[in-house]
A protein has these predicted regions:
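HAMP signal relay module
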Residues: 2-3
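Surface-exposed, proline-enriched loop/turn segments that connect beta strands in immunoglobulin-like
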Residues: 8-9
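ABC-type nucleotide-binding domain
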Residues: 13-269
């Protein structure tokens, strides 16, 4: 496991705007522990990108080009080999780790559900929140009505890894956590890719509510989910190969239109 440590005198992250900047970032899993800055098998090479606060940016491209890796660097699940990532102009390594992660919400395909109650699982987003706050978050993520059909309601034990819940219900709990946590930066990493199309459509409605007013970075496999993004970043092994809005990218022949048309044909078949 990779050990991430605080700076000597870390800055507590407070009242951030949510501007994110990747500056010449180099990263490779094989090179994380190498000494003397020696770099091998890098997934990200001299990667630079600015994300304005309050904007929704989508990362698309084939598997293995570093989309998930890139977003995992923001909360410092890993540290860059070289270059820097800045939030509001400050290198994220200078922020106190706990406060950095407190300001970042992360929704992924494989939702972490532990074997406690539904209420405890929602509280994971903000330990110590009131019952009213928990219920409010559940209503916003459209899972309150389902919870109220259960005999024990919010005190229902969900079983290890949420074995009693469907994929859609688990995802709604993870979205309720975000409403409760209320982070300035939100990462959606293939959040709906494990769901069927009908469930995905419902979850998208919950996600549309939770993204309002935040800086949002989306990793998307299904391109149908990111058409409203302020900017779509198309990645390949060589870095960024295209960028723009959905309509702009569809209008030209290139990586994005090829990906989009291939998926569209796949869905129609």
């Amino acid at each position: 496991p990779v050990t991430i440590v605080n700076d000597v005198n870390p800055i507590i992250m407070n009242n951030i705007k949510g501007n994110i900047e990747f500056d010449n970032v180099m990263f490779g899993y094989d090179s994380v522990d190498l000494e003397n800055g020696k770099v091998e098998n890098n997934i990200l090479k001299n990667f630079s990108l600015k994300i304005e606060n309050g904007k929704m940016i989508a990362l698309v491209g084939p598997s293995g080009v570093g989309k998930t890796t890139l977003v995992q660097l923001i909360p410092r699940f890993y540290d860059v080999v070289s270059g820097s990532i800045r939030i509001d102009g400050v290198d994220i390594k200078k922020y106190e780790l706990k406060s950095l992660r407190k300001n970042i919400g992360y929704v992924q395909q494989d939702v972490f559900i532990f074997g406690g109650t539904i209420k405890e699982n929602i509280l994971y987003g903000k330990p110590g929140a009131t019952d009213e706050e928990v219920i409010g978050a559940a209503k916003k993520s459209d899972i309150h009505d389902f919870i109220m059909t259960l005999d024990e309601g919010y005190e229902t034990i969900v079983g290890e890894r949420g074995v009693t819940l469907s994929g859609g219900q688990k995802q709604r709990i993870s979205i309720a956590r975000i409403f409760l946590k209320d982070p300035r930066i939100l990462i959606l990493d293939e959040a709906t890719s494990a769901l069927d199309n009908i469930t995905e459509a419902y979850i998208q409605k919950s996600l549309e509510k939770v993204i309002v007013g935040r800086t949002v970075v989306v990793v998307a496999h299904r391109l149908s989910t990111i058409q409203r993004a302020d900017e779509i970043i198309v990645m390949s092994r060589d870095g960024i190969v295209q960028r723009g809005k959905h309509e702009e990218l569809l209008a030209v022949e290139g990586h994005y239109s090829n990906l989009y048309n291939a998926q569209k044909e796949g869905f129609i078949r």
